[in-house]
Regions:
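N-terminal secretory signal peptides
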Residues: 1-19
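N-terminal twin-arginine translocation
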Residues: 18-26, 33-47
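N-terminal cap/lid segment of alpha/beta-hydrolase-fold proteins
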Residues: 44-75
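Short beta-strand element of the alpha/beta-hydrolase
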Residues: 79-88
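Short amphipathic alpha-helix adjacent to the substrate-entry channel of hydrolases
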Residues: 94-113, 117-118
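Gly/Ser-rich "nucleophile elbow"/oxyanion-hole loop immediately N-terminal to the catalytic nucleophile
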Residues: 126-168
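Gly/Ala-rich beta-loop-alpha elbow adjacent to hydrolase catalytic centers
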Residues: 169-173, 177
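The feature captures the conserved acid-bearing segment of alpha/beta-hydrolase catalytic domains
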Residues: 199-218
Length: 218
């Protein structure tokens, strides 16, 4: 793994602080920039209030399995546009939940399903390499697409407008954003640094570059 990416990913692991991130910035951009950025990096994570929202864990069945998700939506409203929120390799942690709350405060029903639960708990790993090889690499794209379909159906039954569905995802979830934009009833997608290419396999038969021609959503 690239040394800079390794430092950055290591800093994102549960229990790691901003010191590792500052170290990575120093490696890449020089100590001067890192010193200037340190006060910003040291700030606490954003915590969006739940005032006026209904927020928390929900579940739905997909192919005989129970899938759990975090959802947030404006309280007492229906006909809401839906946003699927897809995490990076670390699963549905507090930042992902907060993204849902931010979207809900803006008038959306946001739902972030736990797409790794059948294979294990990403938060139980302390090393990125082990997390990737022992858990992430074992998650089939077909399973992920089905779970996202289930999340959409749940949203439609709980105040969401299925004519207004969007998806956003981070890193691993960015790749999934591209794939689901070609698979599901999506009007728009926003992929944050998602992987576009890769080796085809039984679990990951296609990558975003392979389905680019059939993407219809912006």
């Amino acid at each position: 793994m690239d040394q800079y990416l390794h430092h950055d990913l290591h800093a994102l692991l549960p229990g790691r602080g901003v010191a590792s991130r500052r170290h990575a910035l120093g490696l890449v951009l020089g100590a001067g920039y890192a010193a200037a950025a340190a006060p910003v990096l040291a700030q606490q994570a954003i915590a969006t209030p739940v005032d006026g929202l209904v927020a928390g864990e929900v579940s739905f069945a997909v192919n005989g399995a129970q899938v759990y998700a975090y959802r947030a939506a404006p309280q007492g409203r229906t006909g809401l546009p839906v946003v699927l929120v897809v995490s990076e390799i670390f699963g549905v942690h507090e930042h992902i939940a907060d993204v849902c709350r931010r979207l809900a405060q803006a008038g959306y029903l946001a739902i972030a399903p736990d797409l790794f639960a059948r294979q294990g708990d990403p938060m139980a790993y302390g090393e990125v390499a082990k997390l990737m090889s022992e858990l992430i690499a074992k998650v089939p794209d077909a399973q992920v697409m089905a779970d996202l379909d289930g999340a959409v159906q749940w949203a439609g039954a709980h105040g969401g407008d299925l004519n207004k569905v969007a998806i956003t995802g981070f890193c691993w979830g960015g790749r999934i954003t591209w794939l689901y934009a070609a698979h599901g009833p999506v009007k728009a997608g926003v992929a944050w640094y998602g992987r576009l290419v890769g080796q085809a396999s039984a679990l990951n038969p296609k990558h975003p570059v392979d389905i680019a021609a059939i993407l219809k959503a912006p």
